[in-house]
Amino acid sequence: MSEISFVTVTALTKYIKRKFDVDPHLEDIWIKGELSNVKIHSRGHIYFTLKDDNARIQSVMFARQNRNLAFTPENGMKVLVRGGISVYEPSGSYQLYAKEIQPDGIGALHLAYEELKKKLSQEGLFDEKYKKPIPAFPSVVGVVTSPTGAAVRDVITTIKRRYPLVKVIVLPTLVQGVNAGESIVSSIEEANRRDLCDVLIVGRGGGSIEELWAFNEEAVARAIFSSDIPIISAVGHETDFTISDFVADLRAATPTGAAELAVPNMLDLLERLKTLEARMTKSMQQDLKKRQERVKNLQSSYAFRYPKRLYAQKEQEFDLIFDRFQKQLAMTVDRKKQKLNEQTYKLEMLHPEEQLKQARKRHEEQTVRLKRNMKVQLKQIHSQFQTVLGKLNALSPLQVMERGYSLTYKENELIKSIEQVHEKDEIRVTLNDGTLTCEVLQKRGETNG
């Protein structure tokens, strides 16, 4: 009987999990169903069961995926869920790891719309204080829309008709379908990153709520709010507003209306210039007439008829001012003289003879102190000198010689050993009181007795 091969539960579960993970059909899949057993964890994770009439699957959506969720999942909602299927090893059950949840059906879309509208309004994304002004005379207008739809043709035609000087840049964008929101966000970010235009039109032609839903996505709303370029929302829906309409700096009911808001009308500008020119001409003529009348009045005035009298009064005023100046100058000189006399008196009070007497007294006192200090210091130096001299004399060879010792030299070299001399050598013996020249008759060391 052959030996049976066993596997552990863990190994089997891991094997099955790998089968799920490598299956391309289960890696990214859309599933339609009804929510039940919805539980929102304190950390933000959402646990729920997705079911239909015949089956159910355990599901989880982690907090990092549900941050942009446009509505709050509740039991009984019909939804479309995108995610991947894998095995939860501890229980050995397969489950759905959700990445995206969308309401299924128009009623659910309206619910999601209202919840997102409330959320963004509370955050302040709709506040007027954040609205950027639309430039009056843009040089470049950017258009975020489908490059093949009627909307882009209407926008370009309207802009060129109204204001031919402007340049139009179209950023080809998906405006309908699953990836439309991501495409709109990408185009807005590209326009800002490259600083492509002065104003941006974001929109499309009309359609159903499902077709316009991309303009109700939170990511699109936040991209519009974060844009440095002013944005005109142009979703072709006369009565209903999209979330993008609330966030945009300006809302137009149609793409054509957005084009009219984005650029001025050249004909209107020309007409306005003509009106301003006529108004300015009339104003200048009126002003010129007033000035001419004023000149006439001046020419007939008293001053022009008697010009000398015009400055006679001024001459008199000048004389009065000059007299006051001279008086003021004399008073100033007198004050300076008085102050000088006071200073002179103070200097005379400080007699130089007294100052010299005090200086001599201080000099004599300092001289006495200096002599006394010098005597003390000389006495100390003499005492130190005698001490050092005594020490030097104690070490001097002359002092040693006074006690009966002598120094013996051979050819000016001091003899320290009998090995330095030989018999018949001439040596010089220095005593305390003189020098002897001697001849060596005999050498005898200590060993010779």
From Swiss-Prot:
Its EC number is 3.1.11.6. GO terms for cellular component: cytoplasm; exodeoxyribonuclease VII complex. GO terms for biological process: DNA catabolic process. Its main location: cytoplasm. GO terms for molecular function: exodeoxyribonuclease VII activity; nucleic acid binding. It catalyses: Exonucleolytic cleavage in either 5'- to 3'- or 3'- to 5'-direction to yield nucleoside 5'-phosphates. Disulfide bonds: none annotated. Keywords: Cytoplasm, Exonuclease, Hydrolase, Nuclease. Bidirectionally degrades single-stranded DNA into large acid-insoluble oligonucleotides, which are then degraded further into small acid-soluble oligonucleotides. Belongs to the XseA family. Heterooligomer composed of large and small subunits. This is Exodeoxyribonuclease 7 large subunit. The gene is xseA.
